[in-house]
């Protein structure tokens, strides 16, 4: 019996060892945080532009002070020396594009933090995966972080957090196989902008079925038709994972009766998925209205929210502005061939 018990224990240990070796360190959550893997954690910031091991905080406030974006805080750090916050940010001149990160894969972006100055609509972030010439993500920085009106508003969700005083955080997992390049362009022709940032990523094997992260930015100002296109021209197999909308109301009254529609896999006149109203899609109801105060009420949850309301005087007055998000984290919209998403302008 002892021999059998020992053999059984050895088999269990061997199985656990193989199981641990197969874990790649992706898809982290409270349920697997205890698990070890061979994934390597790296981080890129102005204090370590390459993310290389043992290369952080090397800027010298004296030797590097005249080098562009190498010792931007040298005046404050000159008496402290190397390793004391010598280069915590970068400056981006008007009409200049700066490479925030360039990473050799395989691996995945796991978290991004940044706090950019300037007009957020005039700063464009782009993500290039592998050998792409055209970016998979091209979006004003404010809209990418659910702050399209250029005004701070706190947001607490699983995918995006906006924290005091203007801290943008992204938790979308973004795998890549060969390499990743992230750039930021300042399209303001007159003003320099500054950004503090940290891009946290892992170097690890990526599953064969892993898709690449994409984001489209579209603006209708004003919306001249009954439908606003959220995304279009998407070909191939994928899944739609979320929407952020900055919506301005140019007349008085309720504005959110429009239905969101998902046209997929050859749908023409009629979609496969059709919602029941704008506030319904963003997981609210009955005009987002607090029935006691008779006012719109902000809310921010892990999956959906109306986190921003910029009010003139009066509950249904013209020129109110809203920020809303809806993440399909547990309910991605899967498609095999193509996808187009629209939302109606109806009040």
Kindly label every feature range from the protein language model.
Residues 16-20:
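Sec/Tat signal peptide C-region and signal peptidase I cleavage site
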């Amino acid at each position: 019996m002892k021999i059998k018990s020992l053999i059984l224990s050895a088999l269990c240990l061997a199985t656990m060892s193989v199981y641990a070796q197969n874990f790649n360190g992706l898809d982290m959550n409270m349920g697997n945080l205890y698990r070890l893997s061979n994934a390597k954690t790296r981080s890129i910031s102005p204090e370590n532009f390459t993310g290389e091991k043992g290369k952080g905080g090397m800027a010298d406030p004296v030797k590097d002070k005249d080098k562009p974006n190498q010792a931007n805080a040298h005046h404050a750090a000159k008496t402290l020396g190397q390793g004391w916050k010598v280069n915590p940010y970068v400056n981006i001149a008007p009409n200049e594009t700066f490479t925030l990160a360039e990473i050799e894969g395989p691996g995945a972006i796991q978290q991004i933090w940044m706090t950019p100055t300037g007009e957020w609509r005039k700063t464009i972030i782009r993500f290039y995966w592998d050998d792409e010439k055209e970016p998979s993500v091209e979006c004003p920085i404010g809209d990418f972080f659910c702050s399209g009106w250029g005004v701070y508003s706190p947001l607490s969700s699983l995918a995006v957090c906006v924290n005091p005083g203007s801290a943008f955080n992204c938790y979308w997992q973004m795998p890549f196989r060969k390499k990743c390049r992230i750039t930021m362009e300042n399209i303001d022709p007159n003003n320099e902008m500054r950004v503090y940032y940290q891009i946290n990523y892992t170097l690890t094997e990526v599953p064969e079925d892993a898709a690449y992260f994409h984001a489209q930015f579209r603006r209708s100002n004003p919306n001249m038709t009954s439908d606003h296109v959220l995304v279009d021209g998407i070909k191939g197999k994928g899944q739609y994972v979320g929407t952020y909308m900055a919506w301005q109301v140019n007349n008085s009254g309720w504005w959110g009766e429009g239905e969101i529609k998902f046209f997929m896999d050859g749908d023409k006149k009629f979609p496969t998925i059709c919602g029941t109203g704008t506030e319904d899609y963003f997981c609210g109801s009955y005009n987002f209205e607090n029935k006691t105060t008779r006012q719109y009420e902000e809310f921010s949850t892990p999956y959906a929210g109306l986190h921003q309301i910029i009010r003139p005087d009066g509950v249904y007055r013209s020129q109110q502005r809203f920020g809303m998000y809806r993440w399909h984290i547990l309910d991605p919209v899967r498609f095999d061939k193509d996808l187009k998403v629209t939302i109606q302008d109806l009040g």
